[in-house]
């Protein structure tokens, strides 16, 4: 192999290795920033055919209805705890911050945060349903499939 071809080969291999490393780092960074959507029942019993449950410490978004009578506010701080339910389960959510104006019992909300060891969601952000005309497709599908009875019909069925 002549020196010119050898140099081209090394340059090509170096460029390919650099691109591979760049892609690996980008994919790793994106993986760390993904928040998967779950319903309360999927958190408790698993999601999909494989019944995959989220791991404690995993970042996630959970969508459901705020259970009537479950909102507890701390009088000395902005801490709030409430329960989200769907047809398959109930999960507790803790939040420290100002709730949206449209947050109320019986309304649909999405809480974004981290799943704790105690199966509680420690939310960083709470989003309240703001418009009846638009709901993200995955939230609408989950709500239609899981909310067929009145709130009083759901029990605390945590494992």
UniProtKB/Swiss-Prot annotation:
Chain residue ranges for the region called Disordered: 130-159
Gene3D superfamilies, per database record: Nucleic acid-binding proteins
Major place of residence: membrane
Residues on Cytoplasmic side: 1-8
One of the record's GO cellular component terms: plasma membrane
Keywords: Cell inner membrane, Cell membrane, Cytochrome c-type biogenesis, Heme, Iron, Membrane, Metal-binding, Signal-anchor, Transmembrane, Transmembrane helix
Transmembrane recorded as keyword: yes
Topology, Periplasmic side: 30-159
Protein topology in the membrane: Single-pass type II membrane protein
One Pfam family hit: CcmE
Function comment: Heme chaperone required for the biogenesis of c-type cytochromes. Transiently binds heme delivered by CcmC and transfers the heme to apo-cytochromes in a process facilitated by CcmF and CcmH.
Protein name, UniProt field: Cytochrome c-type biogenesis protein CcmE
Species: Cronobacter sakazakii (strain ATCC BAA-894)
Gene name of the encoded protein: ccmE
